Amino acid sequence: MNATQSDSAPIGSPCVMVIFGASGDLTKRKLIPALINLKQEGLLSEQFAIVGFAFDQMNTESFRAMLDDEISKFEEHSVDPKLWQWFLDRIYYVQGDFKDPAAYLRLKDQIQEADKIHGTQGNLFHYLAVSFSFFSLIVQKLGEIGLTKEENGKWTRVIVEKPFGHDLSSAQQLNKELKQILTEKQIFRIDHYLGKETVQNLMVFRFANSMIEPLWNRTYIDHVQITAAESVGVEHRGGFYETAGALKDMVPNHLFQLLTLTAMEPPISFEADAVRDKQAEILHALQALTPEDVLQNAVRGQYGEGTEEGQKVPAYRNEPNVAPDSNTETFVALKLKIDNWRWADVPFYLRTGKRLAKRVTEIAIQFRRTPFMLFRKTPIKDPRTNRMVIHIQPDEGISWRFAAKVPGSVMKLGLVNMDFDYARDFGKSHSTGYERLLYDCMMGDATLFQRADMVEAGWAAIEPIIDVWKALPARGFPNYSSGSWGPKEAEDLMARDGRAWRRIGEEEEDAKTSATATENLKGPGTMTK
């Protein structure tokens, strides 16, 4: 399949990108490789520079040497030496404490020098790759020395990483403090899930294809499942995870972003606020949870010992920096409803967790059965036909599962998949998931970034769960083995409604092997699926 593009995308605006926390993994693993990819695509301006700011004792020379040593570890394909030298010549470093006013003056001097050398036209792009507890402090210090001003055609934008607070109150306070220095249009709250092609394609899939949108409602859809599963444990993040847990870490940002893009009404345009208005409507339409709802429709879990790829792995309570009697959840499953005409009485089931059977993120749309089962006497292995799955990671694409007649002399039904695969149809991507987000920030397009009201609405939706779980500490942790799909209570959550979680991986394998399994039913000359 050939990709088509009506017009070439414009080159990103000239700017100095300032990375706070530049010595951390995010810079090496994601940001620099993403910038390299943008340069290779012709989307990064020649008038560009990077200034790293961190506490680590380095200077520009040693920072460049560190990146030079690390780049081969995190860039998926070899980097052209000339291209990499182009970057190194534009990378600078300022050492300092985020609380030290003198460090910000040194930073300002370095920014002005880089601007003069590389002609970045006074445009500034601050990336705060630090804990949210530093967001307000850093923005305040930048404001005090004039590094947040927009004047004479110059722009300044600030990207902040999740989490955006730790509850509704802290999110509201953070937004208030940021807006004392910045306008909403200057604040870009990043969610790297939205940098994935399939997530961006979800709106195109829904609103550019006339055969899809008419089916996208309560009349035809039985329920929706959203899964964000990780096969790894908390690794070196035990200290952070003890203060957060799976609910706060994943639901108000990643999972709610996927939910809103799935459920939103068509926007009047693809301008940033037009899209985000519709996403915010969904968050505000989430049915408020009572304490009884939380007990019935919210499941928490914590992983115990188990195996991952044949290797024994420890329980969460035995991870570094985790309390031996910790009640922090590493798994969450929720049943939510949206109170509007399109989705009334259609449940949305969300689940996320650590040390699960497979690393996968997907949205599964289960369509309703036909009103009259014409082929009800015909054996079929799995009655849950007509399921669409939007695969987000690790393999991006869309598949639609439906019933078809197995070739042969008798009426036998089998399940087949109609697949769109990004790697197969467009070629393998080397994207880190940050390219589009960095480019959009340079261009001032906030469509894929959360707005303040969306952040607060997300926290408000899970506030009842936070309160109930705080009042009623979990019992029986750990309650699922590493390498499983989570606690039994998550299965029960759907079983009570006569439904079940999608058998991720198994269904795809079934589709591949079903032809072989039915070989004896086919006559000569028939085709396999």
Task: Enumerate the language-model features and the residues they cover.
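Secretory/organelle targeting and membrane-embedding segments
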Residues: 1-160, 164-529
